[in-house]
A protein has these predicted regions:
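Catalytic Walker B motif of ABC-type/P-loop ATPase nucleotide-binding domains
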Residues: 163-166, 172
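The feature captures the beta-strand-to-loop junction immediately N-terminal to the Walker
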Residues: 41-46
Length: 184
């Protein structure tokens, strides 16, 4: 039996109302995609072309106007479809009073990871993203690039089968961008 697609999008449309009497905005029109397990897939397009909206629909963060999205064969609108997904949004928000290690640990606990293995996982991930030396610094003192790296670590914390990254190298210096590409 074939494995379900990691991500499948069928005839996706998403429109947004912009105000009373104003025209609707067609963010996504008739997109079909089938991403198999193990594939790396990128979306390229100008600002405002619907890339982030498509990702949010795939993750069930916005409801499609028409069409459907699924993750490993489950509707993306079902809460359990996110159990095997790591997500780095375009502009992640983190609690500035937490340290890097506390932040990654926080997301690991949200994913149901237990304390002892989580502590080692946090150490490994901070090493992977090049922030082991900044693990005990508060995020309020991190640069934009460092915050993106923490975002990558939190997206990887539960060892997801599907990783969705929205502009993962935004604000990261060229060497950091290369490092993130190598992680991907």
């Amino acid at each position: 039996m074939d494995q379900p697609a990691a991500a499948e999008i069928v005839n996706l449309h998403k429109t947004f109302k912009t105000g009373l009497g104003k025209p609707v905005v067609h963010a996504v029109r008739g997109i079909d995609m089938n991403i198999r397990q193990g594939e790396v897939y990128g979306l390229i397009g100008p600002n405002g072309s619907g890339k982030s909206t498509l990702m949010k629909a795939l993750l069930g963060l916005v409801r499609p106007t028409e069409g459907s999205c699924s993750i490993f064969g489950r509707s993306s609108l079902a809460p359990d479809s996110k159990e095997e997904v790591g997500f780095l949004p375009e502009n992640p928000y983190f609690y500035k009073f937490l340290t890097g290690a506390e932040t990654v640990s926080f997301y690991g606990k949200l994913c149901g990871l237990s304390e002892k293995p989580l502590k080692e996982k946090v150490r490994e991930l901070l090493e992977l993203v090049g922030l082991a030396d900044a693990a005990d610094r508060r995020l309020g003192g991190y640069s934009k690039g460092m915050l993106q790296r923490i975002g990558m670590a939190q997206a990887l914390v539960q060892s997801p089968r599907l990783l969705v990254l929205d502009e993962p190298t935004a604000g990261v210096d060229p060497l950091g961008s290369r490092d993130i590409r190598n992680i991907i």
